[in-house]
Amino acid sequence: MKYFATVFLILSTAFLAHSQTYEIGGMIGGANYIGDVGKTNYINPNSFAVGGLFKWNRSARHAFRGSVLIAKIKGDDQKSSNSRRKERGYSFENTVKEVSVGIEYTFWDFDVHAQKAISTPYLYTGLTYFWYDAMYKRGNDVISDYDGASSVAIPMVLGYKANISTNAMLGFEIGARYTFTDDLDGSNPVKGLADSEGLKFGNTNSNDWYVFTGITVTFAFGRRPCYCNF
């Protein structure tokens, strides 16, 4: 085991030393959810979110990107403009922990080592896997968690980034995640309560969304890119 660890460390160091440009950094901002409880605004960050990201710049126009994110999400019928939701009065809080991989595409060429000020809009999509608390509505109309659960989502991100030095980038992005679950708010219980029709409420034919809005800061390392054909 020690031998393999040593070989892995040597190969990793050599790879990074002779690799094309990478970026590493973090993101911070707010999150909101869209579902069967509370407001239905698409962009309404009302809870804290923080994460990290890594990019492998394969050309001046695209990069492979991986990220992690932890976001609080919540909904409160009393803050909704929908009169029926206000009268119902449900509320909940949940925590989403995600891992995402995919491709980031810039509208214009973006050299992370440019000697002049540059900027570009960008798009990102891929596949997200996330963990959250499975929830249900108890008899007293209180929504509570009862187990851990996980699901997948499709991220759809629009952003704008600029260089702030020869190896540092600052960005702003809004990213919606379409999830393959309807239980972030407890409206459609999963796992052991999946067949409990009496616990369901809202539109059970529409899955939940959650949205991250915030800034990203990344730092480039590795040699200046030569950008191969791929």
List each model region and its residues.
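Gram-negative (and chloroplast) outer-membrane scaffold detector with strong preference
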Residues: 60-138, 221
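Residues on the lipid-exposed face of transmembrane beta-strands in outer-membrane beta-barrel proteins
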Residues: 26, 30, 52-56, 101-105, ...
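Extracellular loop and loop/strand-boundary signature of outer-membrane beta-barrel proteins
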Residues: 34-40, 84-92, 141-146, 200-203
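Outer-membrane beta-barrel translocator domains and adjoining extracellular loop/strand segments
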Residues: 36-41, 77-83, 114-117, 134-141, ...
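Repeated loop/turn-to-beta-strand initiation elements of outer-membrane beta-barrel proteins
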Residues: 22, 61-64, 111, 167-170, ...
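Residues that define the transmembrane beta-barrel architecture of outer-membrane proteins
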Residues: 20, 44-48, 95-99, 119, ...
